[in-house]
Regions:
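Bacterial Sec-dependent N-terminal signal peptides
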Residues: 1-33
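Short, compositionally stereotyped local motifs that mark structural "simplifiers"
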Residues: 8-12, 514, 518-682, 691, ...
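Feature activates predominantly on carbohydrate-active enzymes
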Residues: 102-104, 110-321, 326-330, 337-348, ...
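Hydrophobic faces of well-ordered beta-strands that scaffold small-molecule active sites
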Residues: 168-172, 199-201, 286-290, 349-351, ...
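Flexible, acidic glycine-rich loops studded with aromatic residues
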Residues: 401-406, 411-416, 422-562
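Short beta-strand-plus-loop segments that form exposed binding edges in beta-rich domains
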Residues: 737-746, 752
Length: 768
């Protein structure tokens, strides 16, 4: 079986090289690369190896570590078949609490030929040490069945390690689509493996209420179930159109009631306690979110006195919110959170506070009276009043409040923590920390894991600079980072894992490791080493993008396609007749010579035969396209803004024109906001005869045409995505047209390089 030549991607050496593990008496030599994600602060190789045996014991110096020891024993027993004993006092593997320098979660791990010692500065630190120990073992340690013929040896090492940030989180939206307790636990297992310690549980939204509130039983009796909505129907369509079972609605979340097909589910309070206990053993805190005052349709539809008017539904943008003018609505919200705070024994609760439709508030006499009585001038101030009122209630319950970055707009209390999610509100972190409030980074451009992944997604996460424009004092207020999994378009557990992993690993390393340790190439190598482990765990991760080609490629004379893949366990098949590759299609085994215009279709396959993404690329045999004879006189480009609400670039010119703006580069003009449809025209000035590469990044859709030929098709609604195309151009000016649309704070960027791979400054590229 031919595998992807992932080593071709790697240029950096591993932190630790190859260890020859033959020093342990009776142990055959074992070749083992030390490869841990996230990378440790300090790792020193020593001589020898520790071998796990049937008589290995796990000792605890501190009784509170018994759950951690039992967790480790269970982890090591499944694949080995050993009945590992847990005892108080020292063992072959000893767990202890001690004075380890660093933030909460710091640990040391020493592995010698006859023992392993893990010392943490907290329970979470010991768990972090256990997860590093876990990754030192062969990936087969993850097997749920006994594996025979494996030497359970790890290299002798000394590790000193500590997290960069105290908050290393993942959010799961279980409202838009529901996930069972077992499915949530699978996610917690992956989080623990990579030292992530905060699980943000988005329990309610307009599309479903997922937690039992005993005082209000209709929230789950009715609010947890719905008829198929537009998201469900689109998922079903994609599952059929693309032959993708991961996009189908799981049957165990469907029931028939009085002839109606209903989708949903919810957690009882006993379920919640079960998950809390499971997470606690793994060193993970759970932060519950009941989003309010918006995103509450499942509540306001089932109980009177919660919304402004009896008629509930959707406004111009968002759903009918809670009525902050009614005391009955405030009482409802506090009663819900009273039950919630009793269940979750943690410091934080999350109120949401985003995307509130305020139309009703402007018409509601109760809201207007509340504003008058409290000297509030705008409905935005009324929202802040509601948030502050709830925060005082949380504080009385011994909790601190987290909210999405909209809570900044009305002013922050001293105890509020902000989750910065709106990438286009670039000063959110600066404003928050300038007021002395903590901030958690989760900008949607990088950290929304429901956004389609491309070859740049992980790098943009890994290379995020959280310190940009912040003083050292402000930097100290960064609690950490979090990835968010919004599930409108994620109907199944398999699809959720596919969207989140392996990007989750990049977030984990960003949150744990020191900035000076950042090395993208080295991370790619360590990530590559994780795929076998994830396969054995049964995780439905996404095979990273194939590299070595663009969507459109130009060549003159003779070309070649050289495909690389980061996952060494994956197998690549391809076709050239337009059909979808199968396991019976030719296997990619090395560079392919191209002498004529050829359309390639590639598909990766997991070791279990499951199909990955289908990727199409075109290699065009070309000649240099002649330039125009008359040179344009004006530098830059001309952008025409249309009031566009559609989702196809070809339809932009049908919308009314709002204005025309000169721009020096491909960009969104500063005055252009709201419903955006741009048509940017001018000429591309090719400095010389060459094959040029055009990388077009946009959120949402975009297209690029040069010399009346479409070079990049990045059309349709989507998150940040880059598509790359090439064209052979003669020196001189070439007419170009770039189209772009977006409805909510998007991105637009075009990068041009020559055949030497060097970027070309925009100052000489464009004219009109």
């Amino acid at each position: 079986m031919t595998k992807c030549t992932h080593k071709q991607l790697m240029t950096a050496c591993m932190l630790a090289g190859t260890l020859m593990l033959g020093a342990c008496t009776g142990t055959p030599p074992v070749t083992k690369e030390v490869s841990i994600v996230p990378i440790t602060n300090h790792l020193e190789e020593t001589n020898g190896a520790f071998v796990l045996k049937s008589n290995t014991s796990i000792g605890v110096i501190d009784a509170e570590l018994i759950p951690a020891a039992e967790y480790l024993a269970d982890m090591l027993s499944r694949a080995t078949g050993y009945d590992l004993k847990v005892k108080e006092g020292e063992g072959t593997i000893t767990l202890a609490l001690g004075d380890v320098q660093g933030k909460e979660g710091a640990y040391t791990l020493t592995a010698e030929s006859d023992k392993v010692n893990i010392t943490g500065n907290s329970y979470g630190g010991v768990i972090a040490g256990i997860e590093s120990l876990r990754q030192l073992f062969p990936p087969q340690i993850e097997s749920k069945e006994i594996v025979k013929g494996t030497d359970w040896a790890i290299p002798a090492v000394n590790i000193q390690d500590a997290p960069r940030f105290e908050w290393r989180g993942i959010m799961l939206d279980v409202s838009r689509h529901f996930y069972t307790i077992g499915e949530v636990k699978e996610l917690l297992d992956v989080m623990a493996l990579y030292k992530m310690n905060k699980f943000h549980w988005h329990l309610t939204d307009d599309q479903g209420w997922r937690i039992e509130i005993k005082k209000y039983p209709l929230l789950t009796e009715k609010g947890a179930w719905r008829k198929f909505n537009s998201h469900d129907r689109e998922c079903i369509r994609q599952s059929k159109t693309n032959n993708n079972p991961d996009m189908a609605i799981p049957e165990d979340k469907i029931r028939i009631v009085e002839g109606d097909t209903l989708y949903g589910g919810y957690y009882t309070q006993e379920d919640i306690k079960d998950v809390i206990a499971y997470a606690k053993i793994r060193g993970i805190d759970i932060i519950p979110e009941i989003d309010m005052p918006g995103h509450m349709l499942a509540a306001v539809s089932n109980y009177e006195g919660v919304s402004c008017f009896n008629e509930t539904g959707w406004g111009s943008v968002f759903s009918s919110p809670v009525c902050p003018g009614k005391d009955s609505a405030l009482e409802f919200c506090k009663n819900v959170y009273t039950e919630l705070t009793a269940l979750f024994p943690y410091k934080y609760v999350h109120i949401g506070g985003d995307e509130v439709e305020k139309t009703n508030w402007k018409k509601c006499p109760d809201c207007q009276k509340r504003m008058h009585d409290n000297n509030l001038k705008t409905e935005e101030e009324l929202q802040s009043w509601f948030i502050h009122d709830m925060e005082r209630f949380f504080n009385e319950k011994g909790k601190e409040m987290i909210g999405w970055d909209e809570i900044i707009e009305g002013g922050l209390s001293k105890t509020a923590t902000v989750m910065w999610w709106r990438s286009w509100v670039k000063d959110a972190a600066t404003k928050t920390t300038a007021q002395g409030n903590p901030v958690i980074f989760t900008p949607n451009g990088q950290f929304y894991l429901d956004y389609a992944e491309d070859k740049n997604s992980m790098a943009s996460i890994y290379n995020l600079d959280t310190t940009d424009n912040l003083t050292s004092e402000q930097q100290s207020l960064i609690l950490g980072v979090q990835g968010n999994i919004w599930c409108e378009w994620i109907p199944s557990n398999a699809r959720m894992q596919y969207m989140a992993i392996p990007r989750l690993l990049a977030i984990a390393e960003l949150g744990w490791s020191k900035p000076e340790q950042k090395d993208w190439s080295a991370f790619q190598q360590r990530l590559s080493d994780q795929f076998e482990r994830l396969n054995i765990m049964g995780i439905n991760y996404r095979i990273p993008d194939l590299e070595g080609f663009n969507a459109v490629n130009a060549f003159i004379g003779e070309g070649a396609i050289n495909v690389t893949c980061l996952d060494p366990t994956a197998e690549i098949h391809y076709t050239t007749d337009g059909s979808t590759p199968t396991l019976q299609s030719p296997i990619y085994e090395g560079p392919i010579k191209v002498t004529e215009t050829t359309d390639f279709t590639f598909c990766t396959f997991r070791p279990n035969g499951k199909k990955g993404d289908i990727v199409k690329t075109r290699f065009i045999k070309s000649e240099y396209t002649p330039s125009v004879t008359a040179a344009p006189s004006n530098p830059g480009l001309k952008a025409t803004w249309h009031e566009f609400k559609g989702n196809k670039c070809s339809e932009i010119e049908k919308a009314p024109v709002n204005g025309t703006y000169p721009v020096e580069d491909v960009m969104i003009p500063k005055k252009v906001k709201g419903n955006i449809g741009l048509i940017i025209k001018g000429y591309f000035n090719a400095p010389q005869d060459d094959i040029y590469t055009f990388a077009l990044l946009s959120d949402d859709g975009s297209t690029l045409t040069i010399d009346s030929e479409q070079i990049v098709d990045n059309d349709g609604p989507h998150g940040p995505k880059e598509i790359v195309g090439q064209k052979a151009l003669a020196k001189g000016y070439h007419p170009m047209e770039l189209r772009y649309f977006d409805q909510n704070g998007g991105q637009l960027k075009l990068k041009v390089t020559g055949s030497d791979g060097k970027g070309i400054p925009f100052t000489h590229l464009y004219a009109h």
